[in-house]
Structures are given as structure tokens and as C-alpha cells.
């Protein structure tokens, strides 16, 4: 089965072709980072308009790269949520229109299920069951995964997602959007130990997260330094390092608890923050001590992309899941509501 995948949940337009027998044939992506940078964050209306502009050219590019034509495609998978409603509607409308024109099925895919399954596109994919850490700008969740569609939420953030905390902290210190990579880059030049921030909710049982207080601690420290006349680049880097260390250690502690609670030895990390090298190193060290394994997608598939949507959709389409031609998207969509295969 050859599936065309469309991703438009936020500020990346992603298109890919995945074949159930040959694997990933082609993928193309257009990032809107430059478009939104001047505003310090994603502007929903601008995101939607740019998806409209990019979608069809990217589909043509992907078909050409895979040496395929429209009649070769067996089905279309598109992101139906969660995400920005206007942006989601662009992908959904395009998918349903093409499905009608080409007389093939279309299926809306859960954005975070796409992220969760992205490591399965790698040469050494994880095997069920495993614990997944979904960590991005909009989500920070620990999920037990027993199969596709078989998800048990173990814990999630009570306020800011980890990626959101990265972005907001970077913005408060005058760094460019997106803030996560900027914090990581600055942290490489930071001096360890100059600042120490709390590891939120690690002093109590449970698998919930909270990052708003940590963000506030970083802001207060930056303001205190500025008030004292020290707003140097080195101070910014030192705060970035301390902030990143706090987030990474918090996520690592919670992942270790989740593995102990479930008795599992395999951990999947997915979502934009999973590309963070410090986080990967910390989790790999922790899993090494437990004689377990950690899995993640290649860096370009950690952020939003069409490949993960094409793959996730293919798994469901192959067992006959499909929908009518109505267009329905969801800004919020608990993953536990998904059906199992």
C-alpha cells in the first residue's frame, strides 16, 4: 500500500510517500521558522496561509522524488489533530479533496501518534511494549504503549510543556525563535554550577510534570543579573545551561520511575525536544545502567514531518480503517481515545 502523508498541525508543511513493502520513498518539508521569527512565536493565521501556498508544490515535489504519479497512490493520511485548527483544516481539506478526485480512502491521523511511531522508521525499531516520552512544544507525556492504538497515559505536564518552557525561557532572555535550539546552543558555552534551578515535582511520588515554576526561576535569575548590571552573553549561557540541566534531569528521573513502575526496559522518546543532545545522552546513560534500550527518530523526524503521518496512517489503513469525506479536525485530542488495531 502506497500512502501519501500530509502534516500541517502547526508551522511545518510536511509531505511524504510511504510504501508498506518498500518503506519511505520520499519526503519534503517546508519550515515556517523564518516567517514567524519576527513575531517571537507562531502566528496561526500566517501559518494557515503559508500551508495553502506550500502544499501542492510539495506534493508534486514528493511524487517526482519517488518517481510516482497520482494513480499510484492507494490512500492519503493527514494530521487531524491536535494542533492549530486553521492549519489542520488546510491539510484535511487538501487530503479529502484529493481522495475524492482520485477515488481513494483518506484517514485523519493523531499528530502525537505520528511522533510516537516515528522511531519505527529507523533500521532498529522498538518492539512493543515500551514506555514513550512524548516531549514537544505542546506536550510532555509518559505513555505505556502495548501496540498501535493501545496507549495508557502514565503522567503528563500540569502546566507548560517542556518545549514550551524552552521557548518561553529563551524569549525572556532575548533569544530568537524557536527557543529550544537556541537554549541548547547557548548551554554548550555555559559554566556548570554557577546557577542551579529546581527539579520540579521530583521530590514527590508520581509521574506528573510541571515546568512553569522552573521557567519563572530562570526569569527571576535573569532579571536579578540584569538589575545588577550583568546581562552578558556568558551569563545568558550559564542560565541556559542550568535551565537545560534542570529539564533534562527532571525528564530522566520521571522516565526512570515510569520504567520501574511498568517493569519495562525499552524507552521511546519522540517529539521536537527528543532531538536535544543532552536529553538523549542522559536517557542513554540511565537506560545503560538499567540494561535497557532507548529509541528515537533521526533528527529531521523529531520535529513535525509528513513521513511519520504517512507511516502511522499506513498502519491503520492496512487494516481497513477509513473515514467518509467529511472534514473534521480537533485542536485537542486525547491519545487514549484512539482505537487499537
Swiss-Prot record:
SUPFAM superfamilies: Actin-like ATPase domain (SSF53067)
The reaction(s) this protein catalyses: L-threonylcarbamoyladenylate + adenosine(37) in tRNA = N(6)-L-threonylcarbamoyladenosine(37) in tRNA + AMP + H(+)
EC number(s) per entry: 2.3.1.234
Domain of life according to the entry: Bacteria
Cofactor binding note of this UniProt entry: Binds 1 Fe(2+) ion per subunit.
Binding positions for substrate per the UniProt entry: 134-138, 167, 180, 276
Main location (coarse class): cytoplasm
Family: Belongs to the KAE1 / TsaD family.
Binding site for Fe cation: 111, 115, 304
Keyword field: Acyltransferase, Cytoplasm, Iron, Metal-binding, Transferase, tRNA processing
A GO BP entry: tRNA threonylcarbamoyladenosine modification
Cross-referenced InterPro entries: ATPase_NBD, Gcp-like_dom, KAE1/TsaD, TsaD
Pfam family, one: TsaD
UniProt keyword Disulfide bond present: no
Cited function: Required for the formation of a threonylcarbamoyl group on adenosine at position 37 (t(6)A37) in tRNAs that read codons beginning with adenine. Is involved in the transfer of the threonylcarbamoyl moiety of threonylcarbamoyl-AMP (TC-AMP) to the N6 group of A37, together with TsaE and TsaB. TsaD likely plays a direct catalytic role in this reaction.
Protein's name according to its UniProt entry: tRNA N6-adenosine threonylcarbamoyltransferase
Cofactor: Fe(2+)
Amino acid at each position: 500500500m502506497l500512502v501519501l502523508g500530509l502534516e500541517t498541525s502547526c508551522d511545518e508543511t510536511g509531505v511524504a510517500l510511504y510504501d508498506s513493502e518498500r518503506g519511505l520513498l520520499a519526503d519534503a518539508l517546508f519550515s515556517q521558522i523564518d516567517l514567524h521569527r519576527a513575531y517571537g512565536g507562531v502566528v496561526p493565521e500566517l501559518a494557515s496561509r503559508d500551508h495553502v501556498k506550500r502544499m501542492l508544490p510539495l506534493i508534486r515535489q514528493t511524487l517526482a522524488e519517488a518517481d510516482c504519479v497520482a494513480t499510484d497512490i492507494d490512500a492519503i493520511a493527514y494530521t487531524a489533530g491536535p494542533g492549530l485548527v486553521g492549519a489542520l483544516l488546510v491539510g484535511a481539506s487538501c487530503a479529502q479533496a484529493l481522495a475524492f478526485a482520485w477515488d481513494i480512502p483518506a484517514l485523519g491521523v493523531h499528530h502525537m501518534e505520528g511522533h510516537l511511531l516515528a522511531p519505527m522508521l529507523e533500521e532498529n525499531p522498538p518492539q512493543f511494549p515500551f514506555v514513550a516520552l512524548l516531549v514537544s512544544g505542546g506536550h510532555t507525556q509518559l505513555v505505556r504503549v502495548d501496540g498501535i492504538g493501545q496507549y495508557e497515559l502514565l503522567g503528563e505536564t500540569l502546566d507548560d510543556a517542556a518545549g514550551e518552557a524552552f521557548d518561553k525561557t529563551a524569549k525572556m532572555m532575548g533569544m530568537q525563535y524557536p527557543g529550544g535550539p537556541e537554549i541548547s546552543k547557548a548551554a554548550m558555552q555555559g559554566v556548570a554550577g554557577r546557577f542551579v534551578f529546581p527539579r520540579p515535582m521530583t521530590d514527590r511520588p508520581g509521574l506528573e510534570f510541571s515546568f512553569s515554576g522552573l521557567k519563572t526561576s530562570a526569569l527571576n535569575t535573569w532579571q536579578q543579573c540584569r538589575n545588577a548590571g550583568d546581562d552578558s552573553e556568558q551569563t545568558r549561557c550559564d542560565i541556559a545551561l542550568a535551565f537545560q540541566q534542570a529539564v533534562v534531569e527532571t525528564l530522566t528521573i520521571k522516565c526512570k520511575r515510569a520504567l520501574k513502575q511498568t517493569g519495562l526496559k525499552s524507552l521511546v522518546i519522540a517529539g521536537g525536544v527528543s532531538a536535544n543532545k543532552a536529553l538523549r545522552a542522559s536517557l542513554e546513560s540511565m537506560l545503560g545502567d538499567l540494561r535497557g534500550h532507548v529509541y528515537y527518530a533521526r533528527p529531521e523526524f523529531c520535529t513535525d514531518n509528513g513521513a511519520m503521518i504517512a507511516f502511522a496512517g499506513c498502519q491503520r489503513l492496512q487494516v481497513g480503517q477509513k473515514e467518509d469525506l467529511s472534514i473534521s479536525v480537533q485542536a485537542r485530542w486525547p491519545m487514549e481515545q484512539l482505537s487499537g488495531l
